[in-house]
Amino acid sequence: MLRLMRQKKLSIQRRTKTTVSSTTTGGKSKEVQVEVRKKRTVKTDIAQQEEAKLKAQQEAEAKKIAEQKAIEEKARLEAEKVAAKKEADEKVKAETAKPVKSAVDSKVKSVDPEKEKRKAEEAELRRKAEELARQKAEEQARRAAEEAKRYAEADDSDNESSSEDYSDYNLSSRYALEAEDEEDRRNENRGRGKNKVAKAKKGGRDDENSKNSKNERESNRKNQKDAKFGKGKNGKKGAALQQAFTKPAQVVKSDVVIGETITVAELANKMAVKATEIIKMMMKMGEMVTINQVIDQETAQLVAEELGHKVILRNENELEEAVLGDRDVNAEKVTRAPVVTIMGHVDHGKTSLLDYIRKAKVAAGEAGGITQHIGAYHVEMDDGKMITFLDTPGHAAFTSMRARGAKATDIVVLVVAADDGVMPQTIEAIQHAKAAGAPLVVAVNKIDKPEANLDRVEQELLQHDVISEKFGGDVQFVPVSAKKGTGVDDLLDAILLQSEVLELTAVKDGMASGVVIESYLDKGRGPVATILVQSGTLRKGDIVLCGFEYGRVRAMRDENGKEVDEAGPSIPVELLGLSGVPAAGDEATVVRDEKKAREVALYRQGKFREVKLARQQKAKLENMFSNMSEGDVAELNVIVKADVQGSVEAIVQALNELSTNEVKVKVVGSGVGGITETDATLATASNAIIVGFNVRADATARRVIEAENIDLRYYSIIYELLNEIKAAMSGMLEPEFKQEIIGLAEVRDVFRHPKFGAIAGCMVTEGVVKRNNPIRVLRDNVVIFEGELESLRRFKDDVSEVRNGMECGIGVKNYNDVKVGDQIEVFEVVEVKRSI
């Protein structure tokens, strides 16, 4: 019971002692000690009990509702499950009874198939409906459970808020009690105010002294603490806390790791110097750089060593070397077929000769007699020997393509027309062959023509160090006629003889490697690359790393478009399955791991971007001062799209060579494949013309081109393209002005006029003198004044022009020193059209 009382009540007891002054009967003052006792009992637990009771009641109600709902839902689900089971049992019974019934019915009558089908459909529909109903019931049950849960949570939150209210009430009541106590205390002390003041006065000095001594103690303690930690006026820092950094007298030398490329800022960081120091150093070395400029390894090494650091060169392409090193190429070498490149001047009969050899009419399809793409074909001889031919274009613009063809080749067949002799591209072909170190075989074509002169060809080639066997050299000269087929067999024999001398061998078994002859983007097949296999055997399914691209070989086709599963050395094939269009001339290598091949390709792309950026920045810095001094140069923006990579390169190179000091051709975009909407949008943004070489614009691109009035031009022959671009550039040239003399008048007499000053009486000796044209005054055929006419009169009339043989009066504006015998020359400024 006592515990219960303690829980319900809280008793507060307080004793207060005070002194009361009173006067006795004798008149004397007497102080009496009085003790006041107070007791207060506070009920504390009633509100908490009520709160707990209410909370328990609400929780019980919420729990009861949730349980009731769950029981109802469970009962309903059980009922549905029983019904579904019953229906399934009935269905099974019906299905088991069906064969018996059908057997009985078959004796009486034949089964109606339509009826059976309908019944099956009805059963299927019924099953679906039951499934749907079951899903719906489950969904409703889930929702009901969530709703009950939500109600329960809401009740809990309400209970919490009510309990907070109660706690606030208790807190506030406690504060009220404390306030009451404070008030009582003040009332009790009010009667002692006088004595208290007296005591304060009496002990005021002592209190003040104690306060001062306390302040002194605190300040002393603080000073001691400050002195300990090195603070305050007289504080000296401890040895452990003193900063002992002194600037080093010389730069700290360290090892600097430099990759293949590095920015100036990164190099400065690695050497722990300011970037300005490096920029100054490079300016002394004659190089202008910015803080973010990429510099190559050699330059960075030179700068670091100049500043006294030790350089460690890092090889960044370790992964590439590891991937390319992990290849099975140790097989035995066997004799391979020679790769022959046919070179020569335009229309000297290269493609016709190759066509005769292949016995297939491909030359007729070449536009304007120029081979547009590198064609790669292999032919088999009667004795089983094989020769692979590369046909390179002859036009000067395709120099890069021809150089690429020479890199992949073993023997160069130089075709020279017997009636035409050595031409510019013939000389270029000789230079390419020499640069590639490939031996020459000269095919003197068109010997069936009456004006053919074999000796003349030999003499002209002699001037370019191509010495025939007749003159004691080692170059075979074979006279042929591509039209009639004369001497073609002799040419093939000469090629095979030359290949035997070279002793050409390659690994046949093992992982393949080769070179990209041509590449383009096919709309249906994706990136297509023509690859000449140089060693190993390329098989379907191999993983190929090719320049910046990689991929698995999905399909291979030979030059006739026939599917092949493998290709050995010296065999050209079209390959599908690369991630993008590789650049012509890229090396194609078969590797083991596709993931590593992808990493190498991405690394190469990043490296190429860095090098390109470095080149651009260098060009910008080099051209900075020249651009500042020059005026604005007219720019002709061009977007080039072609069917193959080789053509794109050749056209871009030719267009860049057309640029002059006044008009610059800027290729803002180029690529392989048809003209797309992106190209049209770029042309709009950069105010460019679009050039399509053997490609066309798609429907969306045409709509943009028509809407924006973009200049779109299609070509199939490179001569026409270059001529039209020249014409467009000519239109952008600053016009040239020329002065043309239209009349000459001789001064016969001079009159004075009060208004016009000196008036020259003249005879027109040549042409026409016009009133509004500029004039020159000549004395002894020397120009002494240039200006304009103020008046032109014939007798008393003002006229606009005076013709040859007539007299007139001429007043020259702002010039009065006209004398007899002077000549007045009238001219006009004519604009002359310029061309490149």
Swiss-Prot record:
Record's GO cellular component terms: cytosol
Chain intervals for the UniProt region annotation (G5): 481-483
Keyword Lipoprotein tagged: no
Keyword field: Cytoplasm, GTP-binding, Initiation factor, Nucleotide-binding, Protein biosynthesis
Positions of the UniProt region annotated as G4: 445-448
Start-end of Basic and acidic residues biased regions: 83-153, 203-229
InterPro entries, alphabetized: EF-G-like_DII (IPR053905), EFTu-like_2 (IPR004161), IF2_assoc_dom_bac (IPR013575), IF2_II (IPR044145), IF2_N (IPR006847), P-loop_NTPase (IPR027417), Small_GTP-bd (IPR005225), T_Tr_GTP-bd_dom (IPR000795)
Subcellular location: Cytoplasm
Biased composition (Basic residues): 1-17, 192-202
Top-level taxon: Bacteria
UniProt region (G2), positions on chain: 369-373
The UniProt record lists the keyword Protein biosynthesis: yes
Region (G1) location: 344-351
Region (Disordered): 1-43, 83-240
Matches recorded under HAMAP family: IF_2_B
Entry similarity comment: Belongs to the TRAFAC class translation factor GTPase superfamily. Classic translation factor GTPase family. IF-2 subfamily.
PANTHER family referenced in this protein's UniProt entry, alphabetically: TR-TYPE G DOMAIN-CONTAINING PROTEIN, TRANSLATION INITIATION FACTOR IF-2-RELATED
Protein name: Translation initiation factor IF-2
Gene responsible for this protein: infB
